[in-house]
């Protein structure tokens, strides 16, 4: 069975944000605006997305 993935796009700048939010974006493999990253749908990734929800857009499940 294929692992579900999430497609995440960075829509906000990490400038003037807390260092932990910048590090979370790096952990999500995002470092510039409008970059898209495909990540496995795990509880840890969902938690990271929730932490920077104001800076990213989730495009949905990619099976």
Swiss-Prot record:
Keyword Transcription: no
Single GO term (MF): structural constituent of ribosome
Gene3D superfamilies documented for this protein: Ribosomal protein L30, ferredoxin-like fold domain
One example of a Gene Ontology biological process annotation: translation
UniProtKB keywords: Ribonucleoprotein, Ribosomal protein
Pfam families in the cross-refs: Ribosomal_L30
Origin superkingdom: Bacteria
Cited PANTHER family: LARGE RIBOSOMAL SUBUNIT PROTEIN UL30M, MITOCHONDRIAL RIBOSOMAL PROTEIN L30
Subunit structure, interactors included: Part of the 50S ribosomal subunit.
Designated name of the protein: Large ribosomal subunit protein uL30
Encoding gene (name): rpmD
């Amino acid at each position: 069975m294929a692992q579900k993935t999430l497609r995440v796009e960075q829509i906000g700048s990490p400038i003037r944000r807390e260092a932990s939010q910048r590090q979370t974006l790096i952990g999500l493999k995002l470092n510039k605006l409008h970059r898209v990253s495909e990540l496995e749908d795990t509880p840890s990734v969902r938690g990271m997305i929730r932490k920077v929800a104001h800076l990213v857009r989730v495009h949905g499940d990619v099976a």
